[in-house]
Amino acid sequence: MTSGNLNPKPELAISVVLFHSDLDQFDRLLASLSDALLPTQLAVVPVICVDNSLNPDYALRGRAICDRWRGVGGLAIDWVSNAVNAGYGAGHNIALSRLNSRYHLLLNPDVELDKSAISEALRLMDSDPRVALLAPVGFDSHGEPEYLAKDYPSVWVLALRAFAPRWFKRLNTKRLDRYEMRRRADANNVRGIVLASGCCMWVRRGALDQVGGFDESYFLYFEDYDLSMKLAQQGNLLESQAVRIVHHGGDAARKGWQHIGWFMAGAIRFFRRWGWRWFG
């Protein structure tokens, strides 16, 4: 997946995919991006916001927010409204086809970046060319840790997380903790991970092009896990304690039956491609 852009390649480009997302939260994301770009001294950072909502009124409001932030902190923002919603990964692929940079930041609209997140991420990736993907550590809206990086899942663990009552989850704490990779980082505050959350991924663009971007056969869930598995064939996947975000989303099981259906379809596709694990 390469871009036809003939302009000089920027250091960083960013894509955000929205689907009826909270626009107040989207506004806060752009504010955090502007703040996080200040320490980098990057003059221009292209940002493409891809709207899968298929709603003209929503698009008008989203464009107005982009207009307000365009040029602030180097943000060169474009809003793209899709005629068809082909899914989260497909939305990012549209942005990737229009952008070309050394590093690419893939984002959900429901995150906020720490002021040092971008500068720390670029510093780490500059220092180690073997890194294909860098993931942040996450916190929820109340400041509690969110374990965004994951180990390879089993069907049992996914079912526990989605449907089990709390008392039954407590009986399976070790399995759940292992899946959520709740061990500490090493002395350098980084650790290798297996799977990264698509809510926030720094990727080396050359590695991303090698694997062809997102697999668009996933609609909403597990496309990030599939991409992680592919990128692991190109280099290392790391999580850095110095790169921090707040994540306001997640929990597909609480979003209704449609999301549960998308989640199950994505899980089946992922296991068929990368191998079934029933327990563990």
Located regions from the model:
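A short, conserved alpha-helix in the catalytic core of glycosyltransferases
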Residues: A185-N188, G192-G212, S217-R244
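Conserved donor NDP-sugar-binding/catalytic core segment of glycosyltransferases
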Residues: E112-L148
